[in-house]
């Protein structure tokens, strides 16, 4: 009897000494991840030192983190990240209500893409914890963070930023960032407040007009999109008409969302085109369906009308197809951008006109750079009937 008890105790100690407190499903994954890691012993010790209630989260990161992070990332950053993620889960009812799979993959991760690994969680936990205090649910918390982030971190969009994929600390030091850096800030701010968020974007719009990055949030079992400069509502940012034309399965033009856990695909990063270390999933179909539904609803309601825009060389050459010029055009209503696109060039069909679906009874400004590189504006009042607006490069 004593021998049996001794054997059982010994087996229990071995199990605890290996990955105690970690669900068994992680054990072979941890073995594989740590097999050729130069600091495997340190990571095992870190896992063992992690509070038992947080150990699955630490295991999740160790298993799925990029190899470079596993080999070099500061252990105190890992420890801190896990601690504050679970602290948010204990504090916020909307985080407590999340499925484990969403918490682990969309709240817990320490990075949005491949940015420098910063110690952002303690600072953002304090900053945005104040903003969500008193919020009753996830939607209220999301709105509180999204509307306050610009004032809270004091970072604005600026092409003079040092690099594309800036970390929160890098962007806050410069007070400027690209749309990528701004999206990293928002993802991290939302995660700090226990709100599931992930980085999303496209390498290039369907018309090769440029790339863009934004943020997706998980609410009531579905993904919705927003961005750093808070749009009027979820799934209502200016870029939906472009994202809604993204060709599914096209690595150069599809819309992708980042996943910390492998998906079988990767997130294409225009600032690091050869990298495959950031996992991703093609979400183009959702944007196409959403845009088609929006167009159908607006046309049925009679609140919007189609507005075309053509670009010609100058007023003397504005008749033939050969006179047309391909140019990037953005449309605004006041300070709010409503959309953008690229006009048809001389070799495209004359019926190929850049089109926008705009609300009736408002004045819109179309902005583009002329042949001299100067910002040019064309203003048009949109009534109840379709209209075509013309711009000139010279």
Functional labels for PLM-detected ranges:
Residues 1-4:
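Positively charged n-region of N-terminal signal peptides that target proteins for export
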Residues 13-15:
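C-terminal motif of bacterial Sec signal peptides marking the signal peptidase cleavage site
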Residues 17-19:
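Bacterial signal peptide processing site
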Residues 21-37, 41-44:
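A eukaryotic "domain-start" boundary segment
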Residues 41-45, 49-174, 210:
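Secondary-structure boundary elements
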Residues 145, 174-200, 215:
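Cysteine-centered nucleophilic/redox motifs
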Residues 158-159, 192, 203-208, 213, ...:
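His-Asp-centered catalytic microenvironments across diverse enzyme cores
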Residues 369-394:
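Structured interaction patches on ligand/partner-binding surfaces of diverse proteins
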């Amino acid at each position: 009897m004593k021998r049996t008890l001794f054997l059982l105790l010994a087996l229990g100690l071995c199990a605890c000494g290996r990955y105690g407190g970690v669900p068994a499903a992680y054990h072979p994954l941890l073995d594989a991840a740590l097999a050729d890691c130069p600091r495997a012993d340190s990571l095992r010790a870190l896992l063992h030192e992690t509070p038992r209630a947080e150990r699955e989260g630490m295991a999740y990161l160790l298993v799925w983190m990029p190899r470079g992070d596993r080999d070099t990332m500061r252990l105190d950053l890992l420890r801190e990240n896990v601690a504050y993620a679970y602290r948010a889960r204990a504090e916020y009812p909307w985080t407590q209500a999340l499925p484990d799979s969403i918490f682990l993959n969309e709240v817990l991760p320490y990075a949005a893409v491949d940015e420098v690994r910063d110690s952002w969680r303690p600072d953002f936990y304090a900053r945005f914890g104040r903003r969500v205090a008193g919020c009753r649910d996830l939607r209220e918390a999301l709105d509180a963070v999204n509307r306050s982030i610009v004032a809270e971190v004091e970072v604005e969009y600026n092409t003079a930023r040092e690099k594309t994929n800036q970390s929160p600390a890098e962007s806050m030091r410069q007070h400027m960032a690209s749309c990528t850096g701004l999206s990293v800030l928002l993802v991290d701010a939302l995660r700090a407040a226990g709100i599931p968020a992930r980085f999303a974007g496209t390498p290039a719009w369907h018309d090769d007009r440029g790339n863009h990055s934004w943020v997706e949030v998980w609410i009531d079992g579905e993904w919705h999109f927003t961005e750093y400069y808070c749009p009027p509502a979820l799934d209502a940012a200016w870029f939906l008409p472009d994202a809604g034309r993204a060709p599914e399965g096209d690595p150069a033009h599809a819309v992708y969302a980042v996943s910390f856990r492998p998906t079988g695909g990767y997130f294409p990063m225009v600032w690091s085109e050869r990298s495959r270390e950031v996992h991703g999933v093609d979400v183009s179909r959702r944007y196409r369906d959403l845009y088609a539904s929006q167009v159908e609803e607006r046309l049925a309601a009679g609140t919007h009308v189609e507005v075309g825009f053509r670009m010609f060389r100058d007023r003397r050459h504005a008749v033939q197809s050969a006179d047309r010029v391909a140019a990037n055009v953005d449309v605004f209503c006041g300070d709010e951008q409503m959309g953008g696109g690229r006009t048809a060039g001389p070799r495209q069909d004359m019926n190929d006109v850049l089109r926008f679906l705009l609300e009736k009874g408002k004045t819109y400004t179309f902005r583009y750079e002329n042949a001299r590189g100067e910002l040019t504006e064309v203003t048009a009042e949109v009534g109840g009937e379709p209209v075509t607006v013309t711009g000139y490069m010279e």
